């Protein structure tokens, strides 16, 4: 059973923390009186501070990019600490050290829980910008990320085009589709249906784990593909805790149990709502015209088997943004291919970095 202390223990000992006592006003006007940002750094800044790479993580990720993208780090790899200063921060609203629903609310002394405000991808990027400014960084060579991370990459290009030299967005769209919003809402409803949910005001020692596990099981079905699951599991059976199970059932139960050991339900709700709010055109004009206004070089990575963010969405981005190019990851693993085909993704990022030299 996950509790808040257990979540704190999941923050790696290499994690650094930035604290800001300057109030943060969210896009929709809520005030966070103070911020804590958990982040990791690899490598060192060069003399003119021009070698910074910013990595943006996905929904249940953390600042530990060398863990979840391990094959991307090392000598000769895309994220080479001997060449670059690489920074990854835990997003606003998460539960791995950055201010979010599991953080103490200064007004009450208790954790925010359900009182944590609605946030957006833009809020996440603005917090990252505050961190980088505090670190004395004025220029970023590349902002790169996938899924929720890819959404952050796009917002970096619109919010701070003078700071980022180039962008690389993987498995993401310029705005969340009805299909994705529906997936998110179904997962949230699974959490809400848990008897321990209590409107989000659940006891830390008794969280809605059944609901969160069910949400994860649903999500895992959208992160992969028909071809991948059919090839990997088919209709094979195996013995499980509840007797004979299809192998796919056992796998999904395992994934659900794993997530509740490392994540928080309010955090899941907060971040999926932020993803649903994703729309680079909100408040900026017509969608197509906003994309045409993007001036930065951007490489868009499309995964051919991704059922969440299909190729048509990345092709639209590449067609409308004037300095965009598109790459295709032709693999059967679905949306999660960016985490599975790391060697190929590493080569793509490396090639793009070489073009920027």
Curated annotation (Swiss-Prot):
* One annotated GO biological process: homoserine metabolic process
Q: What is one Pfam family matched by this protein?
A: Abhydrolase_1
Q: Which GO terms describe its cellular component?
A: cytoplasm
Residues in the active site? 147, 306, 335
Q: Which ranges carry the AB hydrolase-1 domain?
A: 51-340
Which UniProt keywords are present, listed alphabetically? Acyltransferase, Amino-acid biosynthesis, Cytoplasm, Methionine biosynthesis, Transferase
Major location category of this protein: cytoplasm
**Which reactions does this protein catalyse?**
L-homoserine + acetyl-CoA = O-acetyl-L-homoserine + CoA
Question: What is its biological role?
Answer: Transfers an acetyl group from acetyl-CoA to L-homoserine, forming acetyl-L-homoserine.
Q: Protein name, please?
A: Homoserine O-acetyltransferase
Q: Which organism is it from?
A: Chlorobium chlorochromatii (strain CaD3)
Provide the gene name from the record.
metXA
């Amino acid at each position: 059973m996950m509790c808040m202390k257990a979540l704190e223990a999941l923050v790696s000992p290499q994690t650094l923390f930035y604290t800001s006592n300057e109030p943060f006003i969210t896009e929709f006007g809520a005030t966070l009186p103070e911020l804590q940002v958990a982040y990791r750094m690899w490598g060192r800044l060069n003399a003119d501070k021009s070698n910074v790479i910013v990595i943006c993580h996905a929904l249940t990720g953390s600042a530990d990019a060398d863990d979840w993208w391990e094959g991307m780090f090392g000598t000769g790899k895309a994220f080479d600490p001997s060449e670059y200063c690489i920074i990854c921060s835990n997003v606003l609203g998460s539960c791995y050290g950055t201010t979010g629903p599991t953080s103490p609310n200064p007004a009450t002394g208790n954790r925010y829980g359900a009182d944590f405000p609605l946030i957006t991808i833009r809020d996440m990027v603005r917090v990252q910008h505050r961190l980088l400014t505090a670190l004395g960084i004025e220029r970023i060579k590349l902002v790169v990320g996938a899924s929720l991370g890819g959404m952050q990459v796009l917002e970096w290009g619109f919010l701070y085009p003078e700071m980022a030299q180039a962008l690389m967005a993987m498995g993401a769209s310029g705005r969340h589709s009805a299909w994705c919003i529906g997936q998110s809402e179904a997962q949230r409803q699974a959490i809400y249906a848990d008897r321990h949910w209590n409107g989000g005001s659940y006891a830390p020692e008794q969280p809605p784990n059944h609901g969160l596990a069910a949400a994860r099981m649903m999500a895992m079905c959208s992160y992969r593909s028909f071809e991948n699951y059919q090839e990997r599991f088919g209709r094979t059976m195996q013995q499980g805790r509840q007797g004979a199970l299809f192998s796919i059932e056992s796998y999904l139960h395992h994934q659900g149990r794993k997530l509740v050991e490392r994540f928080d339900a309010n955090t899941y709700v907060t971040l999926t709502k932020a993803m649903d709010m994703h729309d680079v055109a909100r408040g900026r004009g017509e969608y197509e015209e906003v994309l045409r206004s993007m001036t930065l070089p951007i490489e868009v990575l499309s995964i051919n088997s991704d059922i969440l963010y299909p190729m048509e969405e990345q092709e639209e981005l590449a067609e409308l943004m004037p300095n965009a190019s598109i790459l295709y990851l032709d693999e059967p693993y679905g949306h999660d291919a960016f985490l599975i085909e790391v060697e190929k993704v590493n080569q793509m990022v490396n090639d793009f970095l070489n073009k920027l030299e």
